[in-house]
């Protein structure tokens, strides 16, 4: 998505009435998901070419695909073997739709098998980097250099191709690393062009999108803003909309977009549960209410939330109680401020994919979801609230939301704000949450952010924060023995939060942060640095 947007300041401004789906999806590519960890990444790579894409279940019927009228289809990878009885299979009729198809890894093997070829267990699997030797540099492999590094992850190989298919490329261990049926525009690659490790992978994807599928780059921020405002106005009309504002980039971008569309018919409610970072509640109200004249209903519920967590040490219980209390407060305040017809939610496309149940159990072929930790998105939806939903961001990935926010005038400090969990500091305090421990952590966390900002390094990190442990350590301050809390520093780098590395922070910066914390934060006498990546750890401690 590009980031140029015309000014839209009048909620009654007339815009074209073409529906958003028809306008934005007229050059759509579909990814059929067979359980690959990279399916979302494929969609993002396509969208980076400014062409719209969606991830659908492999169970999607041929009629449903026809109705979408895609310019092309991509079959994702997956953990199964196509010759297993329970391996996920798509409708083989898709190969007769007359649209270009690209099979990736498992997707290529499935194409080969369903069209009469043969797939067998490889004598030697390929995992990691491999050199791609090109036999036919046309079509799919145009501008992909011979010998390029590609990322492999397969234990099966195609041993016999269907009639009409040619080999485009091979590796040292795989004779069919890329294949094509040029007449039918069916292509397959045994590697993963979507991952950053595949040099030339982006060129391959662009070849498929632009030259083979004949798409044009129309998926832009400008188009999305216009279409979204048009859709919001058509759906909401003159009805009232309630939005639970958290201060994060998702809800803030949504607030700006809705305010452009419906003006004062939007009510933003900010529930201060007492677990935000130092100065954030005040700054949030200042930005929205004072600077951009978007009224915010501020609800101070700090005491209520703290009382709910008294004596609680289990992290999942914390999350559940915070979510439950949020719903209680939200219900009470919406009743007081209402009535409302619509509830706005900052649902993003990964949430839509996840709720569509697109994971495959490699043993059974059944769709499953694995719980790592419960997530808290402003407490979740109250089930008994009789609101209609409006979710303008449900088509977007996180990076697209940031581009959108920047395009519609959201301040950079919000657009590039580090991700912050819904339960806030409550899950960065290991053990019981008390007012005293909140103050300790809030002050220490402020110093971390203050120092990296002074060094111009804030945006070098995906996240940078402090954690308070439920233990004490012995120290010496002013020739006296101390027995106080240790603070853990957690600074990490990441592209999308799915994986993360601990940041190699300059020692002098760590020293400055440590010195400030032990000298300025009462109750702390030790600072340690977390050097655990994700995996095996998670970004948050709870």
Curated annotation (Swiss-Prot):
Ranges for domain GMPS ATP-PPase: 219-417
Enzyme Commission identifier(s): 6.3.5.2
Keywords: ATP-binding, Glutamine amidotransferase, GMP biosynthesis, Ligase, Nucleotide-binding, Purine biosynthesis
Cellular component, GO, one term: cytosol
Disulphide bridges: none
Domain of life: Bacteria
Coiled-coil residue windows: none
Keyword Nucleotide-binding: yes
Family matches, as HAMAP family: GMP_synthase (MF_00344)
PANTHER family the UniProt entry points to: GMP SYNTHASE [GLUTAMINE-HYDROLYZING], GMP SYNTHASE-RELATED
Subunit description: Homodimer.
Protein name: GMP synthase [glutamine-hydrolyzing]
Lineage start: Bacteria, Bacillati, Cyanobacteriota, Cyanophyceae, Oscillatoriophycideae
Gene: guaA
């Amino acid at each position: 998505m590009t980031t140029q947007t015309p000014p839209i300041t009048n909620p009654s401004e007339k815009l074209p009435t073409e529906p958003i789906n028809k306008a934005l999806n007229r050059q759509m590519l579909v990814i059929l998901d067979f359980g690959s960890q990279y399916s979302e990444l494929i969609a993002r790579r396509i969208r980076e070419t400014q062409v719209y894409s969606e991830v659908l279940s492999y169970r999607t019927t041929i009629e449903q695909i026809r109705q979408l009228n895609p310019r092309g289809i991509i079959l994702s990878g997956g953990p199964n073997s196509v010759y297993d009885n329970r391996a996920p299979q798509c409708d083989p009729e898709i190969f007769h739709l007359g649209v270009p198809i690209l099979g990736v890894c498992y997707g290529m093997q499935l194409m080969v098998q369903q069209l009469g070829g043969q797939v067998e267990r490889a004598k030697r699997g390929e995992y990691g980097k491999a050199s791609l030797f090109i036999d036919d540099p046309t079509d799919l492999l145009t501008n992909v250099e011979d010998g390029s590094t590609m990322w492999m992850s397969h234990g099966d190989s195609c041993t016999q191709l269907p009639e009409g298919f040619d080999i485009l490329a091979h590796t040292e261990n795989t004779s069919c690393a890329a294949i094509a049926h040029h007449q039918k525009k069916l292509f397959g690659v045994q590697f993963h062009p979507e991952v950053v490790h595949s040099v030339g992978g982006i060129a391959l994807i662009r070849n498929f999108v632009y030259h083979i599928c004949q798409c044009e780059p129309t998926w832009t921020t400008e188009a999305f803003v216009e279409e979204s405002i048009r859709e919001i106005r058509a759906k909401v009309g003159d009805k009232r909309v309630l939005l639970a504002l958290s201060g994060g980039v998702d809800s803030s971008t949504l607030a700006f977009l809705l305010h452009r569309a419906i003006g004062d018919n939007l009510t933003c409610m900010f529930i201060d549960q007492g677990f935000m970072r130092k100065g954030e509640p005040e700054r949030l109200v200042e930005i929205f209410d004072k600077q951009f004249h978007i009224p915010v209903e501020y609800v101070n519920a700090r005491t209520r939330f703290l009382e709910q967590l008294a004596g609680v040490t289990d992290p999942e219980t914390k999350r559940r109680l915070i979510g439950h209390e949020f719903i209680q407060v939200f219900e009470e305040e919406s009743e007081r401020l209402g009535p409302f017809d619509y509830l706005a939610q900052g649902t993003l496309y990964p949430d839509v994919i996840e709720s569509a149940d697109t994971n495959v159990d490699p043993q059974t072929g059944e769709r499953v979801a694995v719980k790592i930790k419960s997530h808290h998105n402003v407490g979740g939806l109250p089930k008994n609230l009789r609101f209609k939903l409006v979710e303008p961001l449900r088509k977007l990935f996180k990076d697209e939301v940031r581009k959108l926010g920047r395009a519609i005038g959201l301040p950079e400090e919000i657009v590039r704000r580090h991700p912050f969990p819904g339960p806030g500091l409550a899950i960065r305090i290991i053990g019981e949450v008390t007012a005293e421990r909140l103050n300790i952590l809030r002050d220490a966390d402020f110093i971390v952010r203050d120092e990296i900002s002074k060094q111009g390094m804030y945006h070098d990190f995906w996240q940078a924060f402090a954690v308070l442990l439920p233990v004490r350590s012995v120290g010496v301050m002013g020739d006296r023995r101390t027995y106080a809390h240790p603070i853990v520093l957690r600074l990490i780098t990441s592209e999308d939060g799915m994986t993360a590395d601990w940041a190699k922070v300059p020692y002098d910066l760590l020293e400055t942060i440590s010195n400030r914390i032990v000298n300025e934060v009462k109750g702390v006498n030790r600072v340690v640095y977390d050097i655990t990546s994700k995996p095996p750890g998670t970004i948050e401690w709870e």
